[in-house]
């Protein structure tokens, strides 16, 4: 045993002593209760103290931005990307620029040569009526056995271009090509009546010549009246009516022969 004691005392020389453990005490019955335990020189009795509310710092809501205060923005009304509903969308004909009221007024202006023309309406670029009248004119020629659609469209394009250049030289305000095509197309309506007569009767006699001359004067007078009303060309109706008569005279020759 003396050898074992010597080995035990010489193994791992340290200052630790078993007798020192009895000196450490745990106070379970003191005034601090279970929260006043002292262990390894640390005092945990301070954790249960009461802190007054006025001494606590208020916490601010995190806004996602560093060192920037929270800004209050007024509520905004959401703006719709498209129309709120299909009921509030404009009709398809209005989006295409087709107004049947204006088409009817222009048609009545052509059918009544002595009626005053509304310059604001006639200055619009409306090609729905002229296209319909050109198709109707070609259809009546087809009923008479004359397939002249190419001549009708070609002469119409050349005539509109010539009148466009002439009116821009004569007027102070100028005119668009669409307006010229619209007016000349609407004034083609009496020529449809002439081609309709050619389906039933022959226009190569004296009666046909008089009727053809009347239709040419009707078309040219209506077109010149509309042009001087829309472009404020007072006193120049005869100068405008002459080239219009030449253009409608070509359509009359197609209808007669």
From Swiss-Prot:
Keyword entries, A-Z: Cytoplasmic vesicle, Endoplasmic reticulum, ER-Golgi transport, Golgi apparatus, Membrane, Protein transport, Transmembrane, Transmembrane helix, Transport
Highest taxon listed in the record's lineage: Eukaryota
Disulphide connectivity of cysteines: none
Bilayer disposition of the protein: Multi-pass membrane protein
Lumenal-side positions: 146, 195-196
Location relative to the cell: Golgi apparatus, cis-Golgi network membrane; Cytoplasmic vesicle, COPII-coated vesicle; Endoplasmic reticulum membrane
Pfam families for the chain: Yip1
Residue numbers on the Cytoplasmic membrane side: 1-124, 168-173, 218-236
Chain intervals for the UniProt region annotation (Interaction with Sec23): 75-106
Membrane-spanning ranges: 125-145, 147-167, 174-194, 197-217, 237-257
GO cellular component: COPII-coated ER to Golgi transport vesicle; endoplasmic reticulum exit site; endoplasmic reticulum membrane; Golgi apparatus; nuclear outer membrane-endoplasmic reticulum membrane network; nucleoplasm
Gene Ontology biological process terms in this record: endoplasmic reticulum to Golgi vesicle-mediated transport; Golgi organization; insulin processing; protein transport; regulation of ER to Golgi vesicle-mediated transport
Tissue: Ubiquitously expressed.
InterPro entries recorded: Yip1/4-like (IPR045231), Yip1_dom (IPR006977)
Chain's role: Plays a role in transport between endoplasmic reticulum and Golgi. In pancreatic beta cells, required to transport proinsulin from endoplasmic reticulum into the Golgi.
Subunit description: Interacts with the COPII coat components Sec23 (SEC23A and/or SEC23B) and Sec24 (SEC24A and/or SEC24B). Interacts with YIF1A. May interact with RAB1A. Interacts with YIPF3 and YIPF4.
Family per record: Belongs to the YIP1 family.
Protein name: Protein YIPF5
Lineage of source species: Eukaryota, Metazoa, Chordata, Craniata, Vertebrata
